[in-house]
């Protein structure tokens, strides 16, 4: 019998799936790319919510979700590298440089984000069991 997925994790996964679905409908490549990246980021946040352990730290600099995910879920390292790289383009888009991505770039990221979300959704059941032990 599996443990239920914590509400915060289920909520993040639901938000990831919803954001991804909205990105699918975008006409502009930059907005499609941005939405796909945010959807993947929300899926990553759900893994962090399951695996992260609060730590007392001093003056640590902020760490990207992708760096944290790479540390806490090394089995996702290829994904973290891919989405960490796409974060730079998303930041450029949010700064107004909408021409930094093509339609193909946006479609590729959208496909990757959908695949990543599905992987994380499958992992969530296994991770909730791990967290309970």
Question: What are the residue ranges of the model-derived segments?
Answer:
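Terminal alpha-helical segments
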Residues: 1-133
């Amino acid at each position: 019998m599996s443990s239920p997925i914590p509400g915060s994790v289920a909520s993040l996964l639901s938000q990831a799936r919803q954001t991804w679905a909205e990105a699918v409908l975008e006409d502009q490549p930059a907005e499609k790319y941005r939405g796909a990246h945010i959807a993947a980021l929300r899926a990553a946040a759900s893994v962090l919510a399951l695996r992260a352990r609060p730590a007392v730290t001093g003056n640590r600099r902020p760490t990207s979700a992708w760096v944290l995910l790479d540390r806490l879920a090394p089995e996702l390292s290829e994904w973290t590298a891919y989405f960490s790289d796409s974060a730079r383009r998303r930041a450029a888009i949010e700064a107004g440089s909408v021409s930094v991505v093509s339609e193909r770039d946006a479609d590729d990221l959208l496909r990757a984000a959908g695949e990543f979300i599905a992987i994380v959704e499958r992992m969530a059941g296994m991770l909730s069991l791990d967290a309970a032990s």
